[in-house]
Amino acid sequence: MTTLSPQISPALSIVHPITLDHGKNAHVWDTAGKQYIDFVCGIGVLNLGHCHPNVVNAIVQQAQKMTHYAFNAAPHQPYSLLMDALADFIPTQQPLVGMLTNSGAEATENALKVARFNTKRSAVIAFDGAFHGRTLAALNLNGKVAPYKVGLGALPGPVFHIPFPSPDTGVSAQTAIAALQRLGEVEIGFDEVAAIIVEPVQGDGGFQVLDAEFAQYLRQFCDQHGILLILDEIQSGFGRTGKRFAFEHLGIEPDLLLLGKSIAGGMPLGAMMAKAELFKTMPKGSLGGTYSGNPVACAAALEIIKLLSDAPTLEKWATDYENRVQQHYQQWQQQGLSIVGRLTGIGAMRGIELRHPDGRPGTAELAQILNQAREKGLLLMPSGSSRHIIRLLAPLTIEADTLDHGLRILGDCLANC
């Protein structure tokens, strides 16, 4: 057990009671010197691993030139260079424009402002199992009450939730379409809805992929009703699914796009990108932030984009990762491990569901596996509505033998349930 400062709020939940000291690619070491294979990576922040040398070099070089300047006071070059790079990197028919933020949650908040200002509407439709942040407006979008919304009273809204259709959940496109239509008949007129926000692959919800048929219906539905479609790629973006962004798998494009996590290789940064016309009439000063677009974080992000811009390399990373996970999953099935449910997700964004033969989620078993795996030198992260799905978030750059070693540890823990 680690000893934490008593000045740290107990409202911060900690999955692994250890204190980390340093990391390299897919490994971390705690202050006692114990080494771990890292299948968490800051919860999807390190798609290219801990301390990638190119990223570290970019950070050092920029820190020696300028550590910070508030962009609203006087622009700095890394911000501008990064916005150009993002516009080229994001695969949309027309380049998106936008702003940099400190985090994904802040990107969500600013997207809501843009949507409400442009549509002159206030309602938002989100999805069961969604996670969009812990700030006040963002957390009301989350498709789960505990622990995010408990005891907070009325939250900014109105927000309405419908089922998330996915081959991973068993919820069909038709079921979600019917729920959406019912919403318009019973709860709120669609002419009052500013935006629909959705993750192409749910993160905290359990790495569940949005049904492609529904995604295309949703794009048409939003166009028909003057509703803005916000795609949250905070966790699924920057190569995690084998493409630059997960929306490429779905055959749609967003009106607004939320970015964060792996955008800057561990530096705090997010972005809210959108179609250019959405900013034309917004008041000067309505967007911004003191630390938003910090130059050191921008320098790191520029290097990340360079490293992820080669499509064949990116696809190979994700395919190799996916194939190894599938091979181990098939072995677990062949061994008759009854607690092992579905393999969720796509590319290198994969989840292992734990479920009993009678249908009960394996919440207690997952908690047990987290502890057992850590003792054996593997860090894992829970997800899912019942905390019954193991998130596999190793770096795309993980060595093959390290990935196999980690999956063998996981298999041993599954066999002990």
PLM ranges: what are they?
Residues 1-417:
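Conserved N-terminal phosphate-binding loop of PLP-dependent enzymes in the Aspartate aminotransferase
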